Regions:
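Membrane-embedded alpha-helical bundles of multi-pass transporters/translocases
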Residues: 1-214
């Protein structure tokens, strides 16, 4: 479920970004600036995510990532009208998002191993299928909700200056909802304890496989 919230965060941030740049900052050209900073930072943190994972485990690394994402989005909720602050927030969101993405596939794989440990059946191919499904669901959900919020706020693409209700709606889609997704994901991870028992799970599975091959 936490991975779904991370996907929602990404989908809303990307889906509402262009609307936000035009409706709040006044120019769609600004979107490329803060979006590029986020993408580059996320790519870098994705490649170094193994460092905190090795030191603190997948659960704690994801919680660190969610915290950094929440800080970036929280600052954005307050000072999102300022391009410089928005770029700073984008760097923070990219840093945290890279950690979250780096952990995501690992958590799905661990869950599959846990299922095999509990049931004796390994669900081959479920990991990639799950991530693909979650990505599609989050993108579709985000697109629908962003469109609905824009419609409710009276957003008009052809208008240079949006009304106050439309601007608030853009902030909801681009800042407030992503912040809530980070918070919900963090709360769920508090109750995640698979990291603690996973070494035993791996040992048990290895023993079963050895016995099966004898």
């Amino acid at each position: 479920m936490t991975i779904l919230f991370v996907m929602f965060f990404t989908a809303f941030t990307g889906g509402a970004g262009l609307y936000f740049a035009k409706g709040v900052l006044g120019d769609t050209a600004y979107y490329a600036q803060f979006a590029n900073f986020m993408s580059v930072t996320q790519m870098i943190s994705l490649f170094i995510a193994f460092v905190p994972m090795k030191k603190w485990g997948k659960r704690n690394t994801l919680m660190i990532g969610l915290t950094i994402m929440a800080i970036g989005t929280g600052i954005q909720c307050i000072w999102g009208n300022n391009l410089t602050m928005l770029i700073v927030c984008s760097v923070l969101k990219g840093l945290g998002g890279g950690f979250a993405a780096g952990v995501g596939y690992g958590l799905v794989a661990d869950t599959i191993d846990y299922g095999e440990w509990k049931t004796g059946t390994k669900a081959e191919g479920v990991g990639m299928a799950t991530m693909t499904f979650v990505t599609k669901v989050s993108a579709g959900f985000a697109g629908a909700i962003i469109g609905w919020i824009n419609e409710m706020g009276g957003y008009e693409a052809a208008v240079a200056v949006q009304n106050a209700k439309a601007v608030f709606g853009l902030k909801v889609s681009f800042s407030y909802l992503p912040f809530i997704f980070c918070a919900l994901g963090f709360v769920l991870m508090i109750f995640y304890d698979l990291d603690k028992i996973f070494p035993q799970i791996q040992a048990d599975l290895e023993k079963r496989r050895e016995n099966k091959n004898k």
